[in-house]
Amino acid sequence: MNDIKTPEELLTFMSQNINYGYLGKNGKIYHYADFDFNTKWYEQYILENSEELLNNKYGNCFDQVEFEREWFLKNGYKIETIYEMVKLEYNNEYPTHAFLVYKDDNYWCWFENADSNNRGIHRFTTYEELLSYQYHKYLEYLKKYNIKAEEITKIITTVFEKPKEHISAEEYIEHVTNSKIINFNKK
């Protein structure tokens, strides 16, 4: 990891070495293509630390963001880690997402490896422009799940601090949803 000097090098390293999946409490690695990937997630998921992620070569966006956090902070960047979800009073199947943004010169950059459809470093002139762009990407994805108009108003975006290692999916979601809500222009 010490030989990775730039965000671009980090993205290349991660895209070549980290697969989308997660480590279960039972020690099993769940790959995205596994038949029980989604059904076991809430019951089995634990947040990996960076060493485990490197050894297992699997992590979801939660795990990958913590790996990214470690690298960016070690290399002196100003960062924020952001979470988005549809927060309803009932269980729902809508996907959530965590991602990292960082300041580079006069730009805000969205660093994305876990979401292979949006993989890359996306540069924006303002923080608000970045948040609005990502919100619309998330909304576009949610429409594939036939999200209802009234549920769209329940999308929250939070900025969160580093969670504890090895917490469950439930504990992670509690941590990030109880973090600071970011208000921004979603148009």
Outline where the language-model segments fall.
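A structural boundary/capping signal
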Residues: 1-187
